[in-house]
């Protein structure tokens, strides 16, 4: 299993989530955060010279089966990319074990994959 962490623009979150749901990955963790990379706290739509130390970002974490790595990354990139600096980064790390606390399921059975969440209110 792999943990895929993506730092993206907040306004791209809904589109990325929709793309992940379409490929069978509805479950993820999302955290609001601030940061900057090469753009150094500049936003292309702000007045020239306006600079802040950090820009709003969203970090999403999703644990996937190894075989799904490429399609999950494709979904994130296609939903998050604007082509401008500040689109974000993706980090991938190995997960040794996953355990669903409620049921005790382990490994890939503990992942929220291919489950129908459309019936939830």
Report the location of each language-model feature.
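Positively charged, small/polar-rich N-terminal and surface patches that mediate targeting and assembly
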Residues: 1-121
